[in-house]
Amino acid sequence: PMVVPLKHAFQTACRSNISWDCNLPDECLNLVKSWLKNLSEVGTIEFPRYCFSCERNSIKSVSLVGFADASEIAFGGVVYVRIESPNAIHANLLVSKSRVAPTKPQTIPRLELLGCLLLANLVAPVQSALSSVIDLSPNAQH
């Protein structure tokens, strides 16, 4: 979500067919200024390098959870790993991706399908990488 406004501003600038040495249109400039203001308010975002925060032998189940969404401006997907242990349930962000909606107008259902396709393309390599570390099958006993 952080880069979508910049991608949208770039797309808007490209659509306006301005020359490379001209100033940005006000709409694009306002989007960039708004993004910079919001960026300073975000603070620090930290992600753990190791997603299995509990002992491997105490893990009851591991599952991948994916979400996709779309709007008129963009669509995207995110994949989390959900780890259940006897004491707690942890969820960690693994990967996310966003895309600006195509310049040709699309319906929201079509953009939702593009988001689902993006998510499917995110899940496959994550599942492949994690399957060499831990069993992700639904009935796996850890």
Predicted regions and their residues:
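Structural motif corresponding to the C-terminal cap of alpha-helices
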Residues: 40-47, 51, 55, 82-85, ...
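Conserved, non-catalytic sequence blocks in retroelement Pol enzymes and Pol-derived host proteins
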Residues: 19-30, 54-58, 67-70, 103-112, ...
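A short, polar/acidic, helix/strand-boundary loop motif
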Residues: 83-114
